[in-house]
A protein has these predicted regions:
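Ribonuclease/tRNase effector modules and their secretory precursors
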Residues: 1-92
């Protein structure tokens, strides 16, 4: 799976959150839950994928661009999200 991103946003995520957009492909290759973000009109389809990076549950926000997933943001899930998604992962 090809992953693209804005280099400046990648650097911000690395500096502020310790997460590298390059690693989003690891998240996408594992078990995930993906939902479309329809809270507003972003001008393009936008998705939120929850998955795992090492032992951390993370959320990757992305949009399809050509044959790639273009990463917009990536962050660790908060406690509320962990509880919700852990239950969903447990259900299979």
């Amino acid at each position: 799976m090809k992953v693209t991103f804005d280099p400046a946003k990648r650097q911000t995520a690395l500096s502020e959150k310790g997460l590298d957009f390059v690693d989003a492909s690891i998240v996408f290759d594992g078990p995930t839950i993906t939902v479309q973000d329809t809270r507003r009109d972003y001008g393009e389809a936008r998705f939120q994928t929850v998955g795992f990076l090492a032992d951390r549950m993370v959320m990757v926000v992305w949009t399809p661009r050509n044959e790639a997933r273009h990463v917009i943001s990536m962050r660790k899930c908060n406690d509320r999200e962990k509880a919700i998604y852990q239950e969903r992962f447990s259900q299979g």
